[in-house]
């Protein structure tokens, strides 16, 4: 986290002749491409994705791909026995939960009017438990579980997740997924001007095409979430691939 702060440290250490390694390569392929100039302050860059090596090579920076840590857990996401479960992942930060969970709940309820499905929210942090519990207590088909997200995703037939690492987890679990993201207008304006891609989820950015449905800001409505859930499940095998 805080790469801008870390690069300032690299800069000071470089002046003292101390060699440094930066873990991990900033996502200059997704937003703020000008940050690539800061790579000159480090001696070695460690990357999560192979294609990031090219960005380092463009500024003559020696780099190595160490792989994304989630790949070490790939087997945790494997399971052929799917259940009538929708995995809801509203984000790992309190602001994300506040901004995204309610519309996710409403979207699931509209989709689940026949009550054939159960939604489960994996809890990342104990502190989030009470916030989530307060928001779902009146919804009988929605619950939470204090388990690794892989435990829910590998059983789910579809997922609704907040943009972030959760999208990679859903990809590993081969779960047809709708990505949503709602934030305040100021953050949205700033991010919109800094983003290089038309997409916000990592799988879509890497593929440069819509692997997962994305619903952002005003498009993240209960109606659209319900529609996407129906679409994902109606063509389950295709969306899974």
Regions found by a protein language model. Give the residues of each.
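Residue-level signal for inorganic ion chemistry
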Residues: 45, 104, 225
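Donor-nucleotide binding loops and adjacent catalytic segments primarily
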Residues: 96-155
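Active-site and donor-binding regions of nucleotide-sugar-utilizing enzymes
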Residues: 2-78, 87-101, 110-111, 124-126, ...
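Short acidic-hydrophobic, aromatic-tinged amphipathic segments that line or gate anion-handling sites
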Residues: 47, 64-66, 143-147, 214-221
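Charged active-site motifs of nucleotide-sugar-dependent glycosyltransferases
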Residues: 81-87, 117-118
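Short, hydrophobic alpha-helical segments
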Residues: 229, 233-237
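A donor-sugar binding/catalytic signature common to diverse glycosyltransferases
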Residues: 147-194
